[in-house]
Amino acid sequence: MTGALLALCLLIVATSPLAWDTDRMSLSAQIRGPKAVAGLKALLPVLTASAATDELARLQNINEFFNRRIVFRDDIEVWGQADYWASPLEMLDKGEGDCEDFAIGKYFSLLLSGVPVQKLRLVYVRAQLGGPEGPSQAHMVLAYYAQPGAEPLILDNLITEVRPASRRPDLSPVFSFNGEGLWQGTGSQNSGDPVARLSRWRDVLAKARAEGFQP
């Protein structure tokens, strides 16, 4: 993609009511290379269009964007590490990611589209594969709460449809967190500062801020 096209895309976003640090996003993408630039170019119109819709439509649009654009790969294949949490631009640059990367990309994108942080939580779960008798594995999803205490809607790289938690009996929450708190399961009892207790979350927050994805 040419620099002129990216500049036009960023100009459209910068003049929207939910403008963010487009200069930093553009520079960060250009430093990473053409794949990151192309990924940002594809994402920005989705964010801009989603910001003009209701929150349910934002969930659906952004969930579908990442599920269609990003190929699932384990961290060891993508990064040569057993567990690596990628920033949004890192994932867009690779075009690949695991469940944490999908959830993190959706989290920051929904924040940029205007969804309040209080409505979003990244949730570590045990996912039952292949039915009740199948094996379980560690997994991460993004949960959206329309109101405090409401049943959350689940955004998952395994299923493109956004479903209420009651329709995901295969998921057993372990703990959840966002930029403001850490909770056991999906409960309301705050268990502390997630930045202090989750070193990978601290790292990805810093990277997202450097890229312009985090205020």
Pin down the residues of each PLM region.
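A structural boundary/capping signal
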Residues: T15-P215
